[in-house]
């Protein structure tokens, strides 16, 4: 499997053209363009596992993926878009579990999650119950895969069962504008897949929101606190919402690890928060939190591909400054049709989070007219 690296500048230019065309009706300023590394940029990968008898009658294992068009499976020995640690561990893992039936029997998927700081979580997914024998062999596997300067975590998952050898997360360290930020990233939870592009996104967001220490920030869909932790130093206080329980726990850990004392996470959806802030409903989860104490002049949104729902869009429009990170330029453009009736676009960025795909990640900074 090879990458069309020589075509990367042209492919990126096509994305710029596509985003330019979508946003043209809103008269945006020139874009800030952030190109990706051309290989080994992806920090996580998922593979199905294929079992095949060799000539000796032994069970060989391969990583496989599926062609998105034909749906045909194909063998993957190396994945150039994945970082070097994943590629190294792909070969090492299969070698180390070969011939150990309790580790290979009914193994159907392997997930890898890595960090720039030299950690990897390997999740082994099974169509069987995990036993004490599996646990004993998984502990030995962790020892064999570990080496100086490399932290390896092994997680086993089966129906209604999850066993982590030591822990089920990696600890990432990102150098953002000269400051090291620490993030716990839990396996099987969302994290930004392109770590170096994530740094670009965080630094761009910091520049947009600079000199805001006299007001507060509201963030919807905060995940593990990726943006809110990086932006906390720019504001007096930060209030952030997240619905996923494991992400909230990670965010609380990350807040403590980074010594952030002005960031409050509440577990509720954007739709629920809209109801709360408008006084439509009261929530027990907000006991002890005085929403009126926050003077949020800036709102940060990073919605799913569907974009902002109508109620949230109406609520977002009430804030003087809007920072919008989008993973779908079509729904971004749709949302901007309403937002630009009251706000002007101050800055736009294209972050090439997913090279060699049609996917466009972008950021828009809006100021009330």
UniProtKB/Swiss-Prot annotation:
<dbReference type="GO" id="GO:0030488">
    <property type="term" value="P:tRNA methylation"/>
</dbReference>
<keyword id="KW-0808">Transferase</keyword>
<comment type="similarity">
    <text>Belongs to the class I-like SAM-binding methyltransferase superfamily. RNA M5U methyltransferase family. TrmA subfamily.</text>
</comment>
<protein>
    <recommendedName>
        <fullName>tRNA/tmRNA (uracil-C(5))-methyltransferase</fullName>
        <ecNumber>2.1.1.-</ecNumber>
        <ecNumber>2.1.1.35</ecNumber>
    </recommendedName>
</protein>
<feature type="binding site">
    <location>
        <position position="242"/>
    </location>
    <ligand>
        <name>S-adenosyl-L-methionine</name>
    </ligand>
</feature>
<keyword id="KW-0819">tRNA processing</keyword>
<dbReference type="Pfam" id="PF05958">
    <property type="entry name" value="tRNA_U5-meth_tr"/>
</dbReference>
<dbReference type="GO" id="GO:0005829">
    <property type="term" value="C:cytosol"/>
</dbReference>
<dbReference type="InterPro" id="IPR030390">
    <property type="entry name" value="MeTrfase_TrmA_AS"/>
</dbReference>
<dbReference type="InterPro" id="IPR011869">
    <property type="entry name" value="TrmA_MeTrfase"/>
</dbReference>
<feature type="binding site">
    <location>
        <position position="226"/>
    </location>
    <ligand>
        <name>S-adenosyl-L-methionine</name>
    </ligand>
</feature>
<dbReference type="GO" id="GO:0000049">
    <property type="term" value="F:tRNA binding"/>
</dbReference>
<dbReference type="InterPro" id="IPR029063">
    <property type="entry name" value="SAM-dependent_MTases_sf"/>
</dbReference>
<feature type="binding site">
    <location>
        <position position="192"/>
    </location>
    <ligand>
        <name>S-adenosyl-L-methionine</name>
    </ligand>
</feature>
<feature type="binding site">
    <location>
        <position position="221"/>
    </location>
    <ligand>
        <name>S-adenosyl-L-methionine</name>
    </ligand>
</feature>
<keyword id="KW-0949">S-adenosyl-L-methionine</keyword>
<dbReference type="GO" id="GO:0019843">
    <property type="term" value="F:rRNA binding"/>
</dbReference>
<feature type="binding site">
    <location>
        <position position="302"/>
    </location>
    <ligand>
        <name>S-adenosyl-L-methionine</name>
    </ligand>
</feature>
<dbReference type="GO" id="GO:0030697">
    <property type="term" value="F:tRNA (uracil(54)-C5)-methyltransferase activity, S-adenosyl methionine-dependent"/>
</dbReference>
<dbReference type="InterPro" id="IPR030391">
    <property type="entry name" value="MeTrfase_TrmA_CS"/>
</dbReference>
<feature type="active site" description="Nucleophile">
    <location>
        <position position="327"/>
    </location>
</feature>
<comment type="function">
    <text>Dual-specificity methyltransferase that catalyzes the formation of 5-methyluridine at position 54 (m5U54) in all tRNAs, and that of position 341 (m5U341) in tmRNA (transfer-mRNA).</text>
</comment>
<feature type="active site" description="Proton acceptor">
    <location>
        <position position="361"/>
    </location>
</feature>
<keyword id="KW-0489">Methyltransferase</keyword>
<dbReference type="InterPro" id="IPR010280">
    <property type="entry name" value="U5_MeTrfase_fam"/>
</dbReference>
